[in-house]
């Protein structure tokens, strides 16, 4: 009480270190989320390319399977065989040998199609999971950005109020 003149002195020095720490933490979180989001987006694009390629390969194999099934069906059609008028040796070469080769190729292509279908399902699941992760990260990032913006706005508002109070106190004093 150096001045005992009855005046009251108000000092309003608001400590903004908590706000600065929180803002710094939010900035770090935003930076980390941006990095993760960028990485996941790259993964998604890569998965999308792989999924497209695998789907196209499976479709092509499916078409080959359909053609081979028709071929095997035709080579088993007695009416068609009789209409061709094959001799015994021609029948052996034109029907039996071709049918055996077509059936073997059909089995191979069906096995390949099964493998490709599994790969498409696996890639599709990974793509969906990555998309969900990206959506989740985007929501978190948006929330962090909003929180940082609000914190900055609140800190700025508090600073202006403090300046106004200090100015009013200076005028009153």
Regions found by a protein language model. Give the residues of each.
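Residues at a specific register/face of alpha-helical coiled-coils
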Residues: 2-91, 95-173
């Amino acid at each position: 009480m150096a001045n005992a003149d009855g005046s009251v002195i108000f000092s309003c020095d608001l400590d903004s270190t908590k706000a600065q720490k929180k803002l710094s933490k939010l900035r770090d979180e935003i930076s980390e989320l941006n990095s993760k989001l960028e990485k996941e987006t790259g993964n998604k694009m890569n998965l999308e390319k792989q999924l497209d390629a695998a789907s196209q390969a499976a479709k092509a194999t499916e078409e080959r399977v359909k053609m081979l099934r028709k071929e095997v069906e035709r080579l088993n059609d007695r009416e068609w065989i009789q209409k061709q008028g094959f001799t015994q040796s021609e029948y052996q070469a034109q029907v039996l040998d071709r049918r055996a080769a077509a059936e073997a190729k059909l089995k191979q292509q069906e096995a390949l199609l099964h493998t490709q279908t599994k790969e498409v399902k696996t890639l599709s699941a990974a793509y969906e999971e990555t998309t969900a992760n990206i959506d989740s990260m985007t929501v978190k990032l948006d929330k962090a950005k909003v929180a940082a913006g609000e914190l900055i706005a609140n800190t700025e508002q508090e600073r202006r109020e403090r300046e106004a109070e200090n100015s009013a106190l200076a005028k009153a004093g």
